From Swiss-Prot:
Protein name: Glutamate-rich protein 5
Keyword line: Phosphoprotein
Acidic residues composition bias: residue spans: 404-413
Signal peptide feature range: none
Domain of life, per lineage: Eukaryota
Bias (Polar residues) ranges: 230-243, 271-283
Residues covered by region (Disordered): 1-38, 66-377, 394-453
Annotated Basic and acidic residues bias: 11-21, 305-332, 364-374, 394-403, 414-424
Residues that bear Phosphoserine: 155
Gene of this entry: ERICH5
Organism: Bos taurus
Upper taxonomic lineage: Eukaryota, Metazoa, Chordata, Craniata, Vertebrata
C-alpha cells in the first residue's frame, strides 16, 4: 500500500512515470511478501503508460516493414480490430484519472472496484512482456504481433480468435504475399529446372561415364582379345615351328636313316662285289691249286650261306663293322683254300656269338666256382656233424651203460660242468673247442670221478 499511496499522491504524468519506474525498481528489488494484485497494478501502470507510444511505433513499423504505403486499408483494419484492446487500454487510463482523487481517502480502507479493475488489467497486461520477449527473435514482422496481442491475448479467447487472422493479415501483406509466392513459385521452378538441368546433365555425364567405361571395357576386351589372338598366333607359329622342326628332324632322321640304309645298301653292294671278287679269286686260286671246280663251288655256297647267317644274326650297326672286318679278313688274295674261307666264316660266327658267349661263360663259371667253393665247406661241415653225431651216440651208449651200473647222475653233472667250462673257455679265448676234446675231457672227468669215489 505504501508504494501505491506514494505513486497516487504525485501529480503529473512525468512525476507518475518517474515514481512508477522508481516504485517498479523498488518492487523488483525489495523481496517483501505482498499481494500479487497490488504489485501487478504498479507494473501494469508502468506498462500502460509505455504502451501508447508502442502502438504508434507499431503502426509505423508495420507500414515500413510491409513496404506498401498505398494501402490505407490495413491500418483501418488494424484500427477496426484494435478497439477491444484500445478500449481496454484507455479505460484503465480513464479509470486511473477518475480514481486518482478518491484513492488517497479510500486506500486506508478496502480497495474498490477500480483496484480490482487495475488488478485485472495488470494481470492481463503483465504476461505480454514474456510473450513479447519470446516472440522478438522472429524478426520485425514477428515483433509486431506481440505488440498487437500484448493486451489482448489473455483477456478473452474470442479476441484471440479475431486477432490471429488480423495478425496474419498484417504479417503477410497482399503485395508481398503475391510477390513472395510468385517468387517462391519461380524459385522452385528454377530449382526444378535447375534440377532437371542437373539431372539432364547428370544423365548426359553418366552416359558418358558409363559409355566411356563400356568403351574402355569394350576396348579392353578387344585388347585382351588381341593378346589371345597373338598368343594363338604365336602358339600357332610355335606349333608350326615345332611341326616344322619335327618334320625337319624327322626328315633328317629319315635322311639319316635313308643314308644309313643307302650306306647299308652300298655296303651290301660292296660286300657283294667284294664277295664276288673274293669268290672269283677263291675260285681262281682253288682252280689253280686243286683243279677241282666242284670244291670251289661248294666253298662258295658254304660261304654265301654263312654270310647270310651272319647278316641275319648281326644288327644294322654291327653289319657295317662286321662287313668291314669281314672284307678285310676275306680281302686278302692270299686266301686260296676253301678251308681257309670256311675258317674265317667260322671265326666271324664266333665273333658274332662271342658277345653272348663270354658273358654266358662268365656267368656259368662263377656259379660253378661258387658251388665248388661252397660244396667243400658243406662237405666239411657235414663230415664234422657226422663225427659229432657219432661221438654223441657213443656218449649216450656210455651213459646207458653207466645207468645200468647206477652212476648216471654223476656223469650227467660232470658232462654239464664240462660243457659249461668249454663254453667259458671259448668265450675267454675266442677259440672254438672241438666237441671231441670236450667229450674226452668229460671222459677223463668221469674217470676222475670214479677214482674219487
Amino acid at each position: 500500500m505504501g508504494c501505491s499511496s506514494s505513486a497516487l499522491n504525485k501529480a503529473g504524468d512525468d512525476n507518475r512515470l518517474r515514481s512508477a519506474t522508481e516504485e517498479s525498481e523498488s518492487c523488483f528489488v525489495q523481496p517483501k511478501p505482498r499481494a500479487l494484485g497490488r504489485e501487478s497494478t504498479l507494473c501494469g501502470k508502468v506498462q500502460k503508460e509505455s504502451l501508447p507510444p508502442l502502438d504508434k511505433l507499431k503502426i509505423s513499423a508495420v507500414s515500413t516493414a510491409n513496404g506498401v504505403q498505398s494501402l490505407p486499408e490495413q491500418p483501418l483494419a488494424k484500427e477496426a480490430a484494435d478497439p477491444p484492446g484500445a478500449t481496454e487500454e484507455t479505460q484503465p487510463l480513464q479509470g486511473l484519472k477518475g480514481s486518482e482523487p478518491p484513492q488517497p481517502g479510500g486506500k486506508d480502507g478496502a480497495p474498490g472496484a477500480e483496484g480490482k479493475e487495475e488488478d485485472v488489467e495488470a494481470v492481463t497486461e503483465a504476461p505480454p512482456l514474456k510473450g513479447s520477449a519470446e516472440t522478438e527473435p522472429l524478426g520485425a514482422e514477428a515483433e509486431n504481433q506481440p505488440l498487437i496481442t500484448a493486451g489482448e491475448r489473455d483477456s478473452t479467447g474470442a479476441v484471440e480468435g479475431t486477432e490471429d487472422p488480423q495478425a496474419a493479415g498484417e504479417m503477410t501483406p497482399l503485395g508481398t504475399a503475391e510477390r513472395v509466392p510468385l517468387e517462391a513459385a519461380r524459385e522452385p521452378g528454377s530449382q526444378e529446372a535447375g534440377g532437371k538441368g542437373e539431372q539432364s546433365q547428370l544423365p548426359e555425364t553418366v552416359p558418358k561415364e558409363t559409355e566411356s567405361p563400356e568403351i574402355l571395357e569394350g576396348s579392353q576386351p578387344v585388347e585382351t582379345a588381341e593378346p589371345p589372338q597373338l598368343q594363338e598366333t604365336v602358339g600357332e607359329n610355335e606349333q608350326s615351328q615345332p611341326l616344322e622342326t619335327v618334320p625337319k628332324e624327322n626328315a633328317s632322321l629319315e635322311v639319316s636313316d635313308g643314308s644309313q640304309s643307302v650306306g647299308a645298301e652300298g655296303k651290301k653292294q660292296l660286300q657283294e662285289t667284294l664277295g664276288e671278287n673274293e669268290q672269283s679269286q677263291l675260285r681262281e686260286t682253288i682252280l689253280g691249286e686243286h683243279g677241282g671246280p666242284e670244291v670251289s663251288d661248294g666253298s662258295q655256297s658254304v660261304g654265301a650261306e654263312e654270310e647270310k647267317r651272319l647278316q641275319e644274326m648281326l644288327g644294322k650297326d654291327e653289319q657295317p663293322q662286321l662287313r668291314e672286318t669281314i672284307p678285310r679278313e676275306h680281302g686278302g688274295p692270299e686266301m686260296s683254300d676253301a678251308s681257309q674261307s670256311v675258317e674265317t666264316a667260322v671265326k666271324a660266327d664266333s665273333l658274332h656269338k662271342a658277345p653272348e658267349g663270354p658273358g654266358n661263360m662268365e656267368k656259368i663259371q662263377p656259379e660253378r666256382t661258387v658251388e665248388s667253393m661252397e660244396h667243400p665247406a658243406g662237405i666239411l661241415e657235414t663230415g664234422a656233424k657226422v663225427e659229432m653225431a657219432r661221438k654223441i651216440h657213443t656218449n649216450e651208449e656210455d651213459q646207458h651203460i653207466e645207468g645200468e651200473t647206477g652212476e648216471t647222475v654223476e656223469t650227467e653233472m660232470e658232462s654239464e660242468k664240462v660243457s659249461e667250462g668249454a663254453e667259458t673257455k671259448e668265450e675267454e679265448t675266442g677259440e672254438a673247442m672241438d666237441l671231441s676234446a670236450a667229450t674226452q675231457i668229460g671222459m677223463d672227468g668221469r674217470v676222475k670221478g670214479h677214482s674219487m669215489l
